[in-house]
Structure formats: structure tokens, C-alpha cells
Amino acid sequence: TSFIVTKDTVDLARCRTLGVGHAEDLPKTKGVRAGKKEEKMGWRASDTRELILEDAIVPKENVLGTIGEGFVNFLKTLDAGRIGIAAVSLGIAEGAYEEALRYASVRKQFGQAIASFQGVSFQLADMATEIQAGTHLLYHAAWLKQNGRPFKQEAAMAKLMASDVANKAA
């Protein structure tokens, strides 16, 4: 069974044993330890490690959710996380767009700003359009989640589009 424990989502007073945020916060519970820090392509500020349980005994009062449903709950956290990744990606895309727009407005070629050239202005328009479309996908996925509706597909679509837009814009 897999599960996720974070300080943001766990009542640490209720779940003293598994309130894991960082390896150094790991309580001295027999059979519970943090693995190596994972090397990630992005979002390096988030410390991601495996939680190793070797013959660990979790007291009943520290069990969260239904025993045997940990993997299902884990997958649900990934769905919600996709909304956050989409939001971060769109922020990156917007920052890149604003910088590109600023640069295209001040960079002169042939006596005029390069923003006035069709090739550059089309690229800027495409960036703005894709950012706006990604934002709508993100808001829709977030609205579905907030209103208790299924959002798995929409969250995945928002993350895909937003991360693609961020890569193109950068």
C-alpha cells in the first residue's frame, strides 16, 4: 500500500508518528526512515523522498483513511497536484511572455521595434493566445475540483497544455 503524508494535509497532533515533512523531521519510529532525496527536473524546492517502512507498526490512532486504499488516495493527490503544476507553468509562461514583449518593444532593427514585424508579432500573439487557453483549462479543472466534480482528465489536460506553453514561451 502506498500513501502520502505532508505537513500541509495532516493533523500532526492526530498523526504524530507519520507527520513527515523532511527527513530530519522523521520521528524515531522503529522501521520508519526516509530514503534518498530524489533528483527532479523541476520544482526543486519541494523535497521528495521515498518513505521506507521495514516491519513498521503504525498505531491505529495514527492511521489516516482506510487501510488498503493508500494507493488510490495517492493517485488522487497526483490529480490535484496537476492543477498546481499547471498554475506554476502558466506563471512561468506569463513571465516569459512579458519579457519577450518588453524586449521586442525596445529592440530596434531597420529603424523600428522588432515587435512591429509580422514574424515577431505573430509569435507574441500565439504566446498570448496559448497562455489564455491554458488559463481557461486551469480554471475549469480547479472549478471542477472545488465543486466536488470529477476533474482527473481536465487536470491532466491543463498540466499538459500549461507545461507545453511554458516550454514554448521560454
Task: List each language-model region with its residue ranges.
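C-terminal helix-coil-helix/basic helical segment that borders enzyme active sites and/or dimer interfaces
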Residues: 101-115, 128-161
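Short, intrinsically disordered, charge-balanced linker/junction segments flanking boundaries
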Residues: 162-170
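Active-site lining segments that contact anionic ligands and/or coordinate catalytic metals
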Residues: 48, 80, 152, 157, ...
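FAD-binding core of flavoproteins
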Residues: 1-102, 112
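Amphipathic alpha-helix face/heptad-repeat signature
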Residues: 86-93, 120-123, 127-130, 158-161
